[in-house]
């Protein structure tokens, strides 16, 4: 938030708000898709975000005073990485609406409505023999200069490998791009321009197998590493006073939200121990055993009637993208269990599927969870063959 006292972030496919120094998170959105990549407007009244509905990634606008959500795009493309301009009048974002290629756009936003989307990056055939990317250059992760005149973007222009380096350009259609820092980045780079305009923070795996946070001057130069360790640190965002950087890390296991003090190395984890939900919820407890009742390690997939997947708050959810959209709306989400797991879900009907390698038959159950109710489910796996 603009006052630096709270964060808006994505968790469990919804947007949440949490005051720093507390452990209470309040849910802001609850829709039929997955909501993520929020960005709060400079006046603190609006949140632009991405909603994945199973067929497209569309930009949405949340009115924080009313909770109303309004669609900004409806082009059935991949629209992502939305960022407010410093004056709150425009949004920069990435879209595949032109020829299915990744380009940076700007859109005017006034009184909760979007208008006049413009593609500002140039469609360019690089002629390069790229191994896993198109010959056409792509443009990702725009971030605004504090004066609102320029954008810094990630592009693979002149690169064969990786998502590319960092480039600056005026926030106008067809403007030339100036290289700032040449590096073989990944999609996790996600740079953010500092409020004073002198620095850019980003994530990189430079010289290591882990993504860490790095700091560079906005006009180029050698970067400085900010975080160290056998973990990943990604998605950095400056606070408005430039005294803190919020980021995502798997330090300690599961992904979680952290805040790094600037300057310095002090950091702390933001924990949501208490959650205030928008809709009625219940508790689902699942026990996985063999036929003798002994707890078993297994893979668990829990799918709601709307096709979304659910997992315990302490579990790392994985996504299996090998699916047929004519059969299901979203990817199959799953987590691993040592035998017992408990999660909070919106009231409704769920399909629980449990697998354990090729030796055991798949266990499937349908269960209804009522508001404020507790539902316990035991699935005993049948061993078909001993390999």
PLM features: what roles do these ranges have?
Residues 300, 326-328, 332-333, 347-357:
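A short, solvent-exposed beta-strand micro-motif common in secreted/extracellular proteins
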Residues 282-290, 300, 350, 379:
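A short, amphipathic beta-strand motif
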Residues 291-324:
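Short, ordered, surface-exposed loop/turn motifs in non-cytosolic proteins
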Residues 3-5, 43-45, 87-89, 147-149, ...:
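Short coil/turn segments that connect the beta-strands within blades of beta-propeller domains
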Residues 8-16, 20, 29-35, 48-61, ...:
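A flexible loop/linker signature enriched in serine peptidases of the S9 family
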């Amino acid at each position: 938030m603009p006052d630096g006292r709270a964060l808006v972030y994505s968790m469990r496919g919804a947007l949440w708000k949490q005051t720093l120094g507390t452990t209470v998170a309040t849910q802001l959105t609850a829709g039929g898709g997955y909501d993520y990549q929020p960005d709060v407007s400079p006046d603190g009244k609006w949140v632009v975000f991405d909603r994945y509905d199973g067929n497209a990634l569309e930009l949405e606008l949340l009115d924080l005073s009313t909770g109303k959500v309004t669609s900004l795009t409806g082009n059935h493309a991949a629209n992502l990485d939305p960022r407010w301009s410093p004056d709150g009048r425009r949004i920069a974002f990435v879209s595949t609406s032109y020829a299915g290629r990744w380009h940076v756009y700007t859109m005017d936003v006034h009184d909760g409505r979007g208008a006049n989307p413009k593609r500002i990056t140039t469609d360019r055939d690089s002629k390069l023999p790229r191994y896993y990317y198109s010959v056409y250059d792509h443009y990702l992760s725009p971030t605004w200069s504090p004066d609102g005149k320029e954008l810094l973007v990630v592009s693979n222009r002149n690169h064969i490998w990786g998502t590319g380096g960092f480039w600056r350009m005026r926030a106008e259609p067809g403007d030339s791009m100036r290289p700032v820092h040449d590096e073989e980045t990944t999609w996790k780079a996600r740079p953010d321009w500092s409020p004073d305009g002198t620095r850019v923070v980003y994530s990189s795996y430079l010289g290591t197998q882990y993504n860490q946070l790095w700091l560079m001057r906005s006009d180029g130069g050698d970067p400085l590493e900010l975080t160290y360790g056998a973990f990943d640190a990604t998605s950095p965002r400056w606070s408005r006073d430039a005294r803190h950087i919020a980021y995502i890390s798997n330090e300690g296991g599961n992904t979680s939200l952290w805040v790094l003090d600037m300057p310095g190395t002090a950091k702390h984890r933001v924990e949501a121990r208490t959650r205030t939900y928008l809709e009625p919820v219940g508790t689902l407890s699942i026990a996985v055993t063999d036929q003798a009742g002994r707890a078993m390690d297994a893979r668990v997939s829990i799918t709601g009637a709307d096709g979304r997947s659910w997992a315990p708050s302490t579990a790392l959810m994985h996504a299996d993208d090998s699916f047929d959209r004519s059969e299901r709306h979203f990817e199959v989400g799953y987590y691993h269990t040592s035998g017992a797991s408990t999660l909070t879900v919106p009231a409704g009907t769920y399909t629980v599927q449990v697998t354990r390698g090729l030796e055991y038959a798949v266990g499937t159950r349908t269960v209804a969870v009522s508001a404020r109710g507790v539902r316990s489910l035991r699935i005993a796996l049948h061993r078909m063959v001993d390999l």
